[in-house]
Amino acid sequence: MKFPSKEQIEQYRREYPVGCRVELVSMDDPQAPTKGTRGTVRGVDDIGNLLVRWDNGSGLNAVLGVDVVRKIRG
């Protein structure tokens, strides 16, 4: 797996600020929340993982560039 550049990480952080809401479109993980699950962004780590507190209680991170989430309104 190729890690994103510092510039890409900063772009992710601007695109997904702490507190914004997202909805899961797809995730390549057997423990993934179901499609359509919503959550609140807690941040983006230094390797490009989107840290999300999913509304179903899951804390599984989304890997930007692999998993797909979309921003939603509150």
Q: What do the PLM-derived regions correspond to, one by one?
A:
Residues 2-74:
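Basic/aromatic-rich interaction segments and small domains that mediate binding to polyanionic partners
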